[in-house]
């Protein structure tokens, strides 16, 4: 349910873009993301920081897109969000606290070395997605960018999530093993 709720603004953005234009889709994206936060809070009584950050980025860059009637702002938002995810993972790794371990460590007991590998894998993924978005957004037609944003990046993220889970599962410790450094 939560994952479906996460994708709802993106699906609505795509549908509105197909029937209207990028500006209508951007306005609806801002509204849908706000509604998503409200629904998430009503159901789970909690809103994750990532959702708040995403809402802030959508609101700022979406508003700039609408105010200046320039789709470059909403295109940049995608790359900036991915770059911020990469920076956040790097910062957490440097501080010795894996953000991914914090999110998944209770379900998946693996060595800290594995968490570090997975973190750097995702840093690379986010950086590549950020640059791919810039290239596609500013060198290919708008419709290609919208399709890439909605389907390409979503598919790539799902594929990388599966790869990560398989890798973590393959490296899981049994319950009788010694705890890792930060457990």
From Swiss-Prot:
Coiled coil: none annotated. The keyword Methyltransferase does not apply. Keywords: Cell inner membrane, Cell membrane, Membrane, Transmembrane, Transmembrane helix. It comes from Shewanella frigidimarina (strain NCIMB 400). Its main location: membrane. This is Inner membrane-spanning protein YciB. PANTHER family: INNER MEMBRANE-SPANNING PROTEIN YCIB (PTHR36917:SF1), INTRACELLULAR SEPTATION PROTEIN A-RELATED (PTHR36917). It comes from the Bacteria. GO terms for cellular component: plasma membrane. It is found in: Cell inner membrane.
């Amino acid at each position: 349910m939560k994952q479906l709720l996460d994708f709802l603004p993106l699906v609505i953005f795509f549908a509105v873009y197909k029937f209207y234009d990028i500006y209508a889709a951007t306005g609806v994206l801002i509204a849908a993301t706000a509604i998503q936060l409200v629904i998430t809070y009503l159901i789970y009584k909690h809103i994750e920081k990532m959702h708040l950050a995403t809402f802030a980025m959508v609101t700022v860059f979406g508003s700039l897109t609408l105010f200046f009637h320039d789709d470059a702002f909403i295109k940049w938002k995608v790359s900036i969000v991915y770059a911020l995810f990469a920076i956040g993972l790097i910062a957490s790794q440097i501080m010795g606290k894996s953000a991914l371990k914090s999110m998944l460590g209770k379900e998946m007991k693996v060595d800290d070395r594995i968490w570090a590998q997975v973190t750097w894998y995702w840093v690379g993924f986010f950086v590549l997605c950020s640059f791919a978005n810039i290239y596609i957004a500013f060198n290919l037609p708008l419709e290609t960018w919208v399709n890439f944003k909605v389907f390409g990046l979503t598919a790539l993220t799902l594929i990388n999530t599966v790869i990560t889970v398989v890798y973590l599962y393959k490296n899981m410790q049994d319950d009788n093993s010694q705890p890792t450094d930060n457990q």
